[in-house]
Structure formats: C-alpha cells, structure tokens
Regions:
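Histidine-acidic metal/acid-base catalytic patches
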Residues: 2-22, 70, 88-90, 98, ...
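Glycine-rich, proline-tolerant flexible connector loops at the mouths of alpha/beta enzymes
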Residues: 50-64, 127-130
Length: 352
C-alpha cells in the first residue's frame, strides 16, 4: 500500500495518499482477485463494502475484509448493514424499535473496533420508489419514476397502495421517532469515533404510502434534523441524484447551494454522484452522468470550493454493453477527470 500521510477532514480517523477529493466505489465482500486488480487499475483507493450476510456483521469479519482489501491498496470507507438502514421499526415506531436501535448501536461499535469510521444511514419507512426501467442512451437500462404509478422496494420487500403500513402517519410522529433514535445513536457514534452521513429520501416527495418524507426529503428538514442531533458525528451523505430528483423547487435549494451549506458546516461526509433527466413533478429517468439536466462539473467544482476531502462514489452504475466492468470504468473515469479538472482550475488539491 502506498503511504497515506494525509488525514481526512470529512471523516477523522481516515488517511489518504493524496490531499483533496477522494474517489471510491461499492465492492462486494466476495470480490474476486481480478475484481480487485481491476479497481487497482482504475486507481480506486476507497471501498463501500456491502455485507448482506447478517452473520458477518461482526468486528472480526470487518477486520478480515479490511485486511484483504488493504492488500490491494484499497481502504474500507463504509460498510452497509441493511438491517439497520431504512428500518420501519425505527422510522415508524413499530414493535421491535428498541431492539433495532440496539442492533444499530452494536453495529457502530463493531465498525469502530475494526478501524472503520463511517456509515451511511437512511430514514425511509417504505423503501425506494420507482416505476420500472426504460432504455436510456444506447439502450442502457435506466430507472424511471412516474410518481402516479410507482411502488417502493427495500431489500426485496415491496410497498404499494395508499397506506403501506396500515394507516397514514403524521409529520410529528416521524420527527418524534427520528429524535428518539438519534439521541440514542449520536452519543455512541461520538464515543466510538464513527461518523454517520444521512442519505436523502429517494424519491424526495412529500409523502408516499401514507408516510411523510418531511425530514430528509427537503433542505429545511435536513437542517432541523442536524440541529436535533447536535453532534459533530452526524452529518450528510449527499446523494446528488436524489437532490436532482427533487430539484431546487422541491428540495428548497439546488444541489450547489446544499453542497455549500453542508460543506461550510463540515457536515458533508460522503457524496453519491448521479444524474437524472429532469426534476419532479414530471416523470424522470436516470441518465449517464454526462447526459442529465445537471452540469456535473459544477457539482464537482462546488465540492472543491468547500474543500471537501471525503469520498465521491458513482451511484447506480449503468449496466453497459461490454461486460460488467464497463459501466464502472466509465463512471470512475468521468469522476476522476472532473476531480482533475477542478483541481487544475484551483491550482492545487484541496488543503494543499
């Protein structure tokens, strides 16, 4: 592994080989040696590990994953644990809430014990909603959302209908449930040195299936949520694609303003890079990064302006012709080129 002398401001505890914007991607625990060599060839130095086996959410397993990836010069930035992410028991105060919060707390402790200092959390009670897929540029499979004809999905569970959980929930209930959870989680995160970035709702609309998306579906909700948490360890995982789905009108500010605000507060921990055809309320589809309504160079430039030195990852990587690595290679190359471009514009890497 190359020397890593540069501490990251975005997530203290991590060190990088170079200052400034970092580039990573999602990695399976079952990645082959060739998969990891491919990441080396792309100069990917940060991994978002997706662990689907519940029995492997232990500090010992995390250490094993970390040691293997580091032998290829790749550091784990985040471990995904879907068992404590988008959990209706927590979001809606369903039976088993306290047990799920305790599971979340143990997850944080396991991360810290394994030398992993960041996790992404989302607070959706009924999953990510879509309408289906269509052909994008060159026939690539592209996710579509028409809010009038959509259903939710989270790790295989489908959500449909006017009330996905039996009744309509109020905004006050959602806020009370968030506050109950975050006041238990934040002190543990601080004690363990783990940083939690909260992901926007996808899609960020007022309500779906009787559940308001009033907290992480708009800018003012984010601000209030961070004030309630009142913790340096609770911040934002900014999904650019989700913010673009809502647009400036739906979210309250555009994605550039959001970056400047959260980055200026040192609350920006991680960034998901994705583009879409247009903002709601009209139906939209996901696009290649260079083919949506947002100029992604301006997004990267805003990240550079606030001296963001956390990881940017490609989100919803397109399944291109040419094999499973083609979409990843396109995405990483596009992101790395933008990083190089904005660094050249500023004359140096962030923090240099």
């Amino acid at each position: 592994m190359r020397p890593r002398p540069n501490p990251l401001r975005a997530v203290p505890g991590y060190f990088a080989s170079e200052q400034g914007l970092q580039v990573g991607t999602s990695v399976s625990p079952d990645a082959s040696d060739d998969d990891l060599k491919f990441l080396q060839q792309l100069d990917v130095q940060w991994a978002m590990l997706i662990v689907n086996n519940p029995e492997h959410h232990t500090a010992a397993h995390y250490r094993q994953y970390r040691e293997r990836l580091e032998s290829y010069g790749i550091q784990i930035y985040r471990v995904a644990n879907h068992g404590v992410h988008n959990v209706p028991e927590i979001t809606l105060n369903l039976p088993g809430r306290d047990e799920k919060i305790e599971e979340f707390i143990q997850f944080i402790r396991n991360l810290s014990a394994a030398g992993i200092y960041y996790n992404t959390y989302a607070h959706m009670g009924n999953g990510i909603w879509s309408t289906g897929h269509t052909d994008g540029r060159g026939g690539v499979n592209a996710r579509v959302l028409d809010i009038k004809n959509a259903e939710g999905n989270w790790i295989g569970e489908i959500f449909t209908g006017e009330h996905t959980h039996g009744r309509a929930y109020s905004e006050d209930e959602l806020w009370d449930n968030y506050e109950y959870m975050i006041r238990k989680i934040a002190p543990v995160a601080e004690n363990e040195g783990v940083y939690i970035g909260i992901h926007p709702d996808d899609p960020p609309v007022y309500a779906l299936g009787g559940i308001p998306r009033c907290i992480f579906g708009q800018f003012d909700g984010y601000k209030r949520a961070l004030e309630i948490a009142d913790s340096p360890n609770i911040g934002v995982c900014l999904c650019v694609g989700c913010w673009l789905e809502g647009g400036a009108e739906g979210m309250g500010v555009d994605v550039i303003e959001a970056i400047r605000y959260f980055g200026g507060m040192n609350k920006l921990f991680k960034v998901h890079f994705r583009n879409v055809s247009n903002p709601m309320p009209e139906p939209w589809q996901e696009t290649f990064m260079d083919d949506g309504y947002q100029d992604m160079h301006q997004v990267m430039r805003a990240l550079r302006e606030v001296d963001f030195d956390g990881v940017v990852i490609p989100d919803h990587i397109p399944g291109m012709a040419g094999g499973p690595g083609a979409g990843l290679a396109y995405s990483i190359a596009y992101i790395r080129a933008l990083v190089q471009a904005v660094n050249n514009e500023f004359g140096e890497a962030a923090g240099g």
